[in-house]
Amino acid sequence: ARLTFQEYFERLREDPRRWGKPAAALLGAFLAQKEMGVPSIGGKDSMSGSFNDLDVPPTLVSFALSMTKASRTGSAAFRKAGSLVAFLPLPVDEKTRLPRWKEAGELLDEVAKLVRFGVVNAASVVGEGGVAAAVAKMCFGNRIGFAFNHDVDRRTLFAPLAGSLVLELREGDMCLEGVEYTLIGTTIDRPEIVLD
């Protein structure tokens, strides 16, 4: 994969705090690139986002691009009823809340292998809204519902776990041996989401 960046920051003027925002954002982006071994192919410079006294919110957006055969691409939409669904947490450093980069890369490599072997029906990255939002979006694509397990940790459903993964498994969870995961539920044939 290659990254591209689009950045919007207020006019910097002579205020050191304003200069610190793009510096911190770009240093963080550079750290992620370096640790994951993923280069950036450039981006569009949109630094001046000010008009009179109005400033844009400081923003750095990254898009990841890659090439593959169409036959190897997947979807985030659940494919069939009766599938087990697993949550794979992104390994993070508890002190800094940053990914543990080496382990994160190993997790992504392992999931890529599972996708290639055809044992993953659907995969989604957890973003804003947490695991619950990821599961809901996976339901919408093919109108396949979802029943959360009774013992699911409800505190994690809306927790900020960005970068974690939700996988619909083709045939059980034996394929996840050696990977940290939690079975969170099962797909169902009714277009509804059940949390008892």
Please place each PLM-identified region on the residue numbering.
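A glycine- and small/hydrophobic-rich beta-loop-beta segment
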Residues: 87-90, 95-123
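Glycine-/charge-enriched secondary-structure boundary and capping motifs
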Residues: 18-36, 41, 45-58, 108, ...
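Glycine-rich phosphate/pyrophosphate-binding loop regions near the starts of catalytic domains
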Residues: 1-101
